[in-house]
Amino acid sequence: MARRPVDIPIPASPVQPFPILTEYVDIVAGFGRGSAELGIPTANVPIEQLPSEVNEMATGVYFGWARLRPNMDQEAQVHHRNDGSEVIYNFGSKLSETERGVFPIVLSVGWNPFYNNSKKTVELHILNDFEEDFYGAKIKFSFLGYIRPELNYTTKEALIEDIHTDIKIASEVLHTEPYSSLKNQL
């Protein structure tokens, strides 16, 4: 795969501080831009629920593995975003057995300068097509490596193009050993 000048060389196996594993954390509603504006849905997680070293990590794009599970202690609820739109939290009750497997992910840790965010976020794009949204479900995931630093973009199209390149890089790396077998940690 052709590398971009900003891409960080990915080692043959994870090097410190990787792998970083999380416990199960909540999936929360973000700004609604991933699916609606970019066509790239993301699962947003509260950074304060993650291991402390995540907040100290360089901003940018990472890759790893993730596993979803329903949060069956909850009943469906309607949540309101800051923009007034409504999101149904079904707490993962509609996840099929297959959708509870382990999937490759691309993660963004940062401020999303294209959107001028004022709060650092962690957003995961899970490389799988899901039948339903799963706000409120639980997700456990790993950080296995770093693809590139966070960038600002002049156009939405350039951002989308780079995200698609990130997805290709992550998919390629995660299908090689030892990265592939690290999905068993989840």
UniProtKB/Swiss-Prot annotation:
Uppermost EC category: transferase
GO molecular function: ATP binding; metal ion binding; riboflavin kinase activity
Active site: E123
Catalysed reaction, written as an equation: riboflavin + ATP = FMN + ADP + H(+)
SMART domains per record: Flavokinase
Residues noted as binding Mg(2+) in the record, renumbered to the chain: T42, N44
Entry-linked InterPro entries: Riboflavin_kinase, Riboflavin_kinase_bac/euk, Riboflavin_kinase_dom_sf
GO cellular component, one term: mitochondrion
EC number(s) from the headed UniProt entry: 2.7.1.26
Keyword entries, A-Z: ATP-binding, Flavoprotein, FMN, Kinase, Magnesium, Metal-binding, Nucleotide-binding, Transferase, Zinc
Domain of life per record: Eukaryota
GO-annotated biological processes: FMN biosynthetic process; riboflavin biosynthetic process; riboflavin metabolic process
Pathway assigned in UniProt: Cofactor biosynthesis; FMN biosynthesis; FMN from riboflavin (ATP route): step 1/1
Note on how the cofactor is bound: Zinc or magnesium.
Keyword Ion transport recorded: no
Cofactor(s) the record lists: Zn(2+); Mg(2+)
Family: Belongs to the flavokinase family.
Function (record text): Catalyzes the phosphorylation of riboflavin (vitamin B2) to form flavin mononucleotide (FMN) coenzyme.
Protein name: Riboflavin kinase
Protein source organism: Eremothecium gossypii (strain ATCC 10895 / CBS 109.51 / FGSC 9923 / NRRL Y-1056) (Yeast)
The organism's taxonomic lineage, starting at the top: Eukaryota, Fungi, Dikarya, Ascomycota, Saccharomycotina
Gene encoding the protein: FMN1
